[in-house]
C-alpha cells in the first residue's frame, strides 16, 4: 500500500501528422524537472477521474483516455522524519485534439509539445522515460491494426 498516490496521463496529439507529447516543467523546487501532468487523488475519486482532473488543471486540456494502457511506478521518498514513504504514480495514455494549452501558473512553468525522441531527451527520470517508451510502443502497435 502506498503512503502517497498520484494519477496523471501521458498526453499526446498530432501536429501535421507527427505525434507530439505534452511535457510539463514544474515550478519552485520542481522547476528543473520535466514530466507528465499528474497530481494527488482526492477523496472519492477514481484513478481516471484524478488523471482527467489533473490534466485539465495543469494544461487546460480536455483529453480522452485510451483503453488498455495503465502504468504504475512505485518508489520510496526520502523525507525528513519519514525515510520510507512509498509513492505510487499511475499513468494513463490520453489524446487531445484542436485545443489551446493553458499552463496552470501556480504549478507549471512551461508546457512544450515534443515528438517522441525530443520528449525522451527532456525527461530526467528513468521511470518517465520507460513510461513514454511504453506509450509510444503501444500507439505504434495500435496504429498498425
Model segments located where?
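Nudix hydrolase/Nudix homology domain
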Residues: 29-34, 101-145
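Active-site segment of metal-dependent pyrophosphate-handling enzymes
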Residues: 60-100
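N-terminal strand-loop-strand
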Residues: 1-36
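Short, charged/polar surface micro-motifs in flexible loops or helix N-caps
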Residues: 16-18, 29-31, 42, 71-75, ...
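A general structural signal for short secondary-structure boundary/capping elements
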Residues: 54-58, 67-72, 134-144
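The catalytic Nudix box helix
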Residues: 36-69
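Conserved hydrophobic/aromatic beta-strand scaffold that supports enzyme active sites
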Residues: 10, 23, 91-93, 113
Amino acid at each position: 500500500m502506498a503512503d502517497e498516490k498520484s494519477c496523471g496521463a501521458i498526453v499526446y496529439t498530432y501536429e501535421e501528422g507527427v505525434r507530439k507529447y505534452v511535457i510539463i516543467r514544474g515550478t519552485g523546487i520542481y522547476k528543473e524537472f520535466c514530466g507528465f501532468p499528474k497530481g494527488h487523488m482526492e477523496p472519492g475519486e477514481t484513478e481516471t477521474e484524478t488523471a482527467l482532473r489533473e490534466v485539465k488543471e495543469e494544461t487546460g486540456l480536455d483529453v480522452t483516455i485510451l483503453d488498455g494502457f495503465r502504468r504504475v511506478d512505485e518508489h520510496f521518498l526520502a523525507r525528513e522524519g519519514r525515510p520510507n514513504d512509498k509513492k505510487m504514480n499511475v499513468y494513463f495514455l490520453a489524446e487531445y485534439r484542436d485545443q489551446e494549452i493553458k499552463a496552470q501558473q501556480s504549478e507549471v512553468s512551461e508546457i512544450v509539445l515534443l515528438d517522441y525522441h525530443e520528449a525522451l531527451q527532456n525527461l530526467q527520470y528513468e521511470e518517465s522515460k520507460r513510461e513514454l517508451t511504453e506509450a509510444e510502443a503501444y500507439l505504434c502497435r495500435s496504429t498498425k491494426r
